[in-house]
């Protein structure tokens, strides 16, 4: 039985940073065949329209198995770098799944990926790390950076990115334009101004 493979985006820093990191997370979800969920705090749930008709991208916080989701900080026990350092995830640099030690180990239920200004989980941007990350069901993405340009450097994503964005410099424009539309309460404030 194949479980869902999801990315849960966690808000961090100011609104502009949140928007840019959100579209980067969405792009990563597209490239890896994951469901993209947004863990918005209750006071920000109406900020943007739902981008997908008939469904929601909001994470149902009350049913989520990870406690204290907004209070994990930038380097919790399940952070990707800590899992690498403790050998709970092992990367051998080869694309052969049989040679990767994660095949013989139980895969963590979730990995916390911190791509904030401190760049705690830098190995994420190395292509050989995408194979073990692909085996994890839940990626909790804690980011305040627009990291979409860095995805272009990962060999496994380059062909798909070229197909999706023939003009590479249009990536942010197209993603922002598609994904982030102000919600009705925001439009109400804008029109009353």
Locate each region found by the language model.
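Secretory-pathway glycan-assembly enzymes, especially type II membrane glycosyltransferases
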Residues: 1-193
């Amino acid at each position: 039985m194949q479980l869902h493979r999801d990315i849960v985006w966690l808000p961090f820093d100011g609104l502009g940073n949140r928007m840019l990191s959100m579209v980067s997370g969405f792009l990563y979800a597209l490239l890896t065949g994951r469901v993209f969920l947004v863990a918005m705090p209750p006071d920000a749930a109406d900020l943007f329209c739902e981008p997908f008709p008939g469904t929601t991208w909001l994470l149902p916080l009350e049913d989520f198995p990870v406690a204290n989701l907004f209070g994990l900080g930038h380097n919790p026990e399940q952070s990707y770098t800590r899992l690498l350092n403790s050998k709970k995830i092992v990367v051998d640099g080869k694309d052969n799944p049989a040679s990767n030690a994660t095949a013989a180990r139980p895969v963590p239920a979730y990995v916390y990926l911190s791509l904030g200004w401190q760049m705690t989980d830098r190995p994420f941007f190395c292509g050989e790390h995408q194979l073990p990350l692909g085996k994890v069901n839940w990626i909790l993405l804690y980011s305040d950076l627009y990291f979409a340009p860095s995805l272009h450097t990962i060999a496994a994503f380059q062909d798909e990115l070229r197909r999706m964005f023939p003009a590479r410099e249009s990536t942010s424009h197209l993603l922002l334009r598609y994904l982030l539309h102000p919600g009705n309460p925001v439009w109400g404030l804008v029109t009353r101004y």
